[in-house]
C-alpha cells in the first residue's frame, strides 16, 4: 500500500509539473510583430519617406527621384526593416556601402534621417522600447552610409 501511495504522489507531482509547463506564457512577439508586421512597417516607411521629402536638411538627396523610384525605395526600406527585425523578408538590394558610395552623407544628414524615422514611428504610436530596439537594429548601417 505504501508503494502505491508513493507512486500516486509521484504521478500527482508530475501531473502538476506538466500542467504548469503547459500553461506557461507564450514568448513575447518579436520586433517585427511589434511593429505590425509587413503592413505596419510599410506604413512607417511611407511616413518616413514623406518626412524625408519634406525635410530641407536632406530632401535634395531625393529631388530627382520619380514615382517608380520612390516606390522601389519604399519597398527596399521595408524589406531591410523586415529583415532586421526578425520578419520573413529578405533584403535583396545592394549593400549600403555600395549604394551610398560617393554620396558623402554627413553626420548631420544621418541625424536628420534618424529624426525623420523617429517622427514616423511616433506618428504610428510605436512604443519607446520597440522604437529603441529598431534604431539599435539599424544603427550598424551608419558606418556604411556616413562619409562614403
Where are these regions (language model features)?
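Compact alpha-helical subdomains of small soluble proteins
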Residues: 56, 68-129, 137-142
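Bacterial N-terminal signal peptides that target proteins for export
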Residues: 1-10
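Bacterial signal peptide processing site
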Residues: 22-24
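Post-signal-peptide N-terminal segment of Sec-exported extracytoplasmic proteins
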Residues: 28-31, 35-75
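Short, solvent-exposed mixed-charge patches
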Residues: 147-148
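C-terminal motif of bacterial Sec signal peptides marking the signal peptidase cleavage site
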Residues: 17-20
Amino acid at each position: 500500500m505504501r508503494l502505491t501511495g508513493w507512486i500516486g504522489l509521484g504521478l500527482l507531482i508530475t501531473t502538476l509539473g506538466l500542467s504548469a509547463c503547459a500553461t506557461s506564457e507564450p514568448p513575447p512577439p518579436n520586433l517585427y510583430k511589434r511593429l505590425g508586421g509587413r503592413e505596419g512597417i510599410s506604413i512607417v516607411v511611407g511616413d518616413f519617406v514623406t518626412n524625408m521629402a519634406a525635410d530641407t536638411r536632406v530632401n535634395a538627396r531625393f529631388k530627382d527621384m520619380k514615382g517608380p523610384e520612390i516606390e522601389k525605395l519604399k519597398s527596399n526600406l521595408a524589406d531591410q526593416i523586415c529583415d532586421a527585425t526578425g520578419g520573413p523578408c529578405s533584403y535583396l538590394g545592394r549593400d549600403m556601402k555600395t549604394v551610398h558610395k560617393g554620396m558623402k552623407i554627413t553626420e548631420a544628414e544621418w541625424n536628420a534621417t534618424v529624426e525623420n524615422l523617429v517622427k514616423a514611428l511616433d506618428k504610428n504610436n510605436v512604443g519607446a522600447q520597440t522604437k529603441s530596439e529598431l534604431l539599435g537594429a539599424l544603427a550598424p548601417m551608419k558606418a556604411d552610409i556616413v562619409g562614403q
